[in-house]
Structure formats: C-alpha cells, structure tokens
Regions:
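Flexible extramembrane loops and terminal tails that flank transmembrane helices
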Residues: 1-13
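Glycine-rich, flexible loop/turn motifs
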Residues: 2, 89, 95-98, 103, ...
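Glycine/serine-rich anion-binding loops at beta->alpha junctions
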Residues: 104-113, 155-156, 308, 312, ...
Length: 435
C-alpha cells in the first residue's frame, strides 16, 4: 500500500466504526455482570477477538483493489449459497437452523451471504446500466436477492430475510429503476404484513369474530380469492395488449400485488414458528402475554426509560444486572446502553450511525465507478436498516425480529461480515477517482 493510499483512507468512517466496536465491547461486558458484581460471561473476550479480526480484515481489504471483487462476483455469490444450503439441512441451534457449528463456534452463514449479494447485484446493475428502465433487469435483480433470501426465510429467519429486501430496494433505487417497480415490492411487503397480522389482531387482541378478517386465515378462501384476482388480471392483461389503455395496466399491477400479498402472508403462516408469530402479536400489544412473549419488549422499554437523560452509570443498570432483560448482549444491547448512559448516550450512537451512513453516501457520490456506487448503496441500505429496526425493536415501535445492532451487538459473524463491507468501502474511497 502506498503512503498516498494510506493518507486517503476515510478516517472519519473508520474511527466511527471503531468507536461503536469499543462501546459494544464495554456493554457486552456489562451485560455479563450480575447484580452482585460477579462476571458470569466471557462474551466480551470473544467479541474483542472478532472485532480485532474484523478490523484487520477491513484494513487488508482496503489495500486490495475492490475491482477484484467485480471479477469474482458470480463465484462469491454461488459460493455463499453452499453454507446457506448446508445450514438449512444440517445446522441447528435452539429454535432455528441459522447457525453452522465449527467446534465451539457458531457461524451465521446468512451474514456473509448479504455481502455476496451486494457484490453480485452491484456487478449486474453496473453491467446493465444502459437498460436501467427494463422490467427484465428488475426481475433479474429480484432473483439475485430472492434466492438466498428464500433459503434464509425457510430456516426460518425473518429478520435477516428482511435485510435482503433493504439491500434490493436501496441498490435498485440508486440504479434508476422505475419507481413503480420499487413501489410494487414495497406494496407487496406492506400488504403481506397486513394480511398476516390482521387475523392475529382479531384473535388475540380484539377477541371478536369479524368474518372478513377471519377469511384471511382460511386457506380455501385465500386460494379462491387468488384465483378470482388471477382471472381479473388475465382479462386486464388481454385488454392492455389489445387496446393499449393504461387503466388495464394498472389493474394488472394492483391485482398482482394482491395475489402475491395473499400468497406471501399464507406462506408466512406455514413457515414461521409459534414464537415468531407471538412476537408479532406482542408487538401489537405486549400485555397480551406480559410474562411470556411480551416480556422482552416490556423490559426493554423499561430499561431505556429508566436511563433518563444521563443514565444510571456504567455497571449500575438494574434491568440488565438483575437479569430481567433476555438476549441483552445481542438483540437488546441498545437497551443496556441507554439504561446506563441515558438519552445523551443514545444520541451518541445515533450520531455515529448517521456519520457512517453519511460517509458511505459521500463515497458513493464521489466515485466514478458504477460498480462502486452500487456497493456503497447496498452497504448504506444494510447498515441503516439494521440500525433502524434494532433500535425500533428495543423501543417497541418495531416487532422483535432478531436483527442485531451492527458493530455493537455480540456476534462474530455479524461483526466480521460488517467489517468486510467496511473494508470494501475504504478501498472504494481510496480509489474513488479511478476505475
């Protein structure tokens, strides 16, 4: 690496991430201390090891020309499918099949698949820039993302599957793909969630039978409704091809959204485990099961609220040290952090993530290479989604999905994969004016 390249590293991005890693290690340590002051977990030591490996990987990748990943994008993508499939068939940890066991370590293959998808999708978008309005181009983009996403969702890991959607939307938006295509995906997600949650709301919260809502949980009615909508779509498609009227096109568009949303919501009921269904229910009302599925949300909100403006002090939190808050070193690390550092500490984390995303967008804006632009867009979308969903989850404004707070939550796979992405961004920044 030349001295000039060393000087060109984006130190603001790099040290913002180092700061988050250090904060994460301190509060992973805090999560392992009981109310009597005993340390009952060595997770912080493992996190130090993974963070060190991740920092080294980021530095090494910043030295390597990122264009080499353009050349091997397809191979990386196909290779990432192997551990995903192996995990699906053979990996088992607690409630899901998300982890590969290697000795005493668990490897989350889906974390590395995100990076492979970003690289592969960036190459395809860069290679097809001249055809950026094509529906076929958007369809291929969806297939690149939906194949690994489908494997992850079937494990089932809803949270990680949603991260793939954020990558797809952010990268295709930057590529200039027609907004109606992005709106189609977004509408399918919204209506799928609506059709999935509404019967749960009726059963567990409203507790009164509404036939129209109950029908959304009836497989026979869903199939009949989908067939009816399909017939309407077919007639509308014929009308559009024959008469070239735009209202036929939009009728096909809307009915397709409804068909896919009904199908996706029904498939979700078959795939999701009972504990995942309960997470959706307690998101609507945690008091439905305050000592069961709603416990995490209630205790997390209590922890954040008890922190006040300046926090209770390092190692002084009650929710964490009295072990009221489960998964406190992973999903709910922000809850512990806010309890002990308060609102002002939470603002620091918000500011650091804002800086990281701003620096990625700045690199994206200044680089002259389309491949680099799309890689940065995918990384920014992934980092922002992780942050917004995890923090929203701890505050009770998002359902619990198991998405970690990148760079702070305990987890070697997430840290290492994220730092690989950071290394790519640093490499792009160094070479942003050359192709």
């Amino acid at each position: 690496m030349k001295l000039r390249d060393f000087i060109e590293i984006d130190y603001i991005l790099f040290f913002s991430i180092i700061t988050l890693l250090i904060l994460g290690i301190f509060f992973i340590y805090s999560s392992g201390v009981t109310s009597t002051g005993n340390l009952v977990s060595n997770e912080y030591i493992r996190q130090i090891i993974w963070a060190s490996i991740g920092i080294a990987a980021a530095i090494v990748l910043s030295i390597v020309n990122y264009r080499k990943f353009y050349d091997i994008a397809l191979y990386l993508y196909l290779f990432s499918m192997v551990p995903l499939l192996y995990t699906f068939f053979f990996g088992r940890v607690v409630h899901s099949t998300r982890w590969l066991r290697i000795g005493s370590f668990g490897i989350q293959a889906s974390e590395f698949a995100k990076i492979a998808v970003i690289i592969m999708l960036a190459r395809y978008l860069a290679d097809t820039e001249r055809d950026n309005k094509s529906f076929f181009r958007f369809f291929i983009c969806c297939m690149i993302v939906f194949i690994p996403m489908g494997i992850v969702l079937s494990q089932p890991d809803l949270g990680t599957a949603l991260v793939f959607i954020s990558i797809l939307l952010s990268m295709t938006f930057v590529s200039g793909i027609l907004m109606r295509y992005l709106l189609f995906i977004g509408s399918c997600i919204v209506f799928s969630g609506f059709f999935l949650v509404l019967p749960l709301w009726q059963t567990y919260i409203f507790r009164k039978n509404i036939p129209a809502i109950a029908a959304l949980a009836n497989s026979k009615i869903i199939i009949l409704a989908a067939l009816f909508l399909f017939i309407i779509a077919a007639i509308a498609m014929f009308g559009f091809l024959k008469f070239k009227k735009r209202y036929f096109y939009w009728l096909v568009y809307i009915t397709a959204i409804m068909i896919l949303s009904l199908g996706a919501s029904y498939a979700a009921r078959l795939v999701l485990k009972n504990y995942q269904i309960m997470r959706l229910i307690v998101f609507l009302d945690p008091n439905v099961d305050p000592r069961g599925a709603g416990w995490n949300i209630i205790q997390s909100i209590t922890a954040i609220g008890s922190g006040g403006l300046t926090g209770m002090g390092f190692l002084q939190g009650t929710q964490s040290h009295y072990r009221y808050l489960p998964e406190q070193s992973t999903d709910f690390i922000f809850s512990i952090f806010s309890e002990e550092t308060g609102f002002l500490g939470g603002l620091v984390v918000f500011a650091l993530f804002f800086i990281i995303c701003q620096r990625l967008l700045r690199i994206m804006k200044t680089t002259t290479d389309p491949f680099a632009v799309y890689v940065c867009a995918g990384l920014a979308g992934m980092f922002c989604f992780h942050f917004l969903v995890n923090v929203g989850m701890t505050m009770g404004i998002m359902p619990i999905t198991g998405i970690p707070l990148l760079f702070m939550s305990y987890g070697g796979s997430a840290v290492l994969a994220a730092m690989i992405g950071v290394g790519l961004a640093l490499s792009i920044h160094i070479r942003r004016y050359s192709r």
